Regions:
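N-terminal non-catalytic structural scaffold regions of very large proteins
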Residues: 1-210
């Protein structure tokens, strides 16, 4: 929420300094990003330690670098039968508008190239809830792979007729700062008003793309 409000301030009044920190909105954001970088390194270390403990308990979370041909063939068949029919691929070009990306949504994004050399952007929502996120891999240990890893690996099967130049998984975090008091109308039912506020928060500008 705080970062969202600072981004708004940076656009509207970028040279105004905060009376508590003595910093402009841009300077505060830079300080926050420096602190967040340290927190992210700490988060990654904690995650790796937790995954080691889970592995010691006989449960593994893997990607395609850690499986054999037999497991890879099974996952391809699983993708074709259980995931591919349920995904909704989007192609973005000059005539196709960029879609709205949901807050905290996970998306497989690819740069597509046609035979004539023209590029387009391909997007696939990966956590729509229509298929399980954890896919079990046949192995001696209890082994799983994330559905988004599966989608990204086989994404060329979805966008047939294109060459995949680059691909990645992204997640968008949207601004959660909204002034409810400024928007409140006494003639509205308060419950309906708050429902509208919550819906509006989900469509505010992005503050982070991972």
């Amino acid at each position: 929420v705080r970062v969202g409000s600072l981004i708004d301030q940076m656009i509207v009044s970028k040279n105004v300094k905060d009376n508590k920190t003595g910093m402009t909105a841009k300077e505060q954001i830079q300080a926050i990003l420096a602190r967040v970088a340290k927190l992210n390194r700490r988060k990654d270390t904690v995650y790796e330690n937790l995954m080691d403990e889970v592995a010691q308990a006989g449960i593994r979370l893997v990607d395609f670098r850690k499986i054999g041909k037999k497991e890879g063939k099974y996952l391809e068949q699983y993708f074709d039968a259980e995931i591919a029919p349920l995904i909704s691929p989007i192609v973005v070009g000059k005539r196709q508008p960029f879609p709205f990306l949901k807050n905290k949504g996970i998306y497989a994004v690819v740069v597509l190239e046609k035979k004539n050399g023209k590029e387009k952007l391909g997007i696939i929502p990966c956590n729509s809830g229509v298929f399980p996120r954890l896919v079990q891999v046949p192995a001696e240990e209890e082994t799983y792979m994330l559905a988004e890893e599966l989608i990204l690996h086989f994404i060329s099967k979805v966008f047939k007729g294109y060459f995949v130049k680059a691909k990645s998984l992204i997640r968008v975090t949207r601004n959660a700062d909204i002034d409810a008091d400024a928007l409140y109308d006494e003639d509205l039912d308060y419950r309906d008003f708050m429902e509208g506020i919550i819906k509006k928060r989900k469509r505010l500008l992005p503050v982070r793309v991972e």
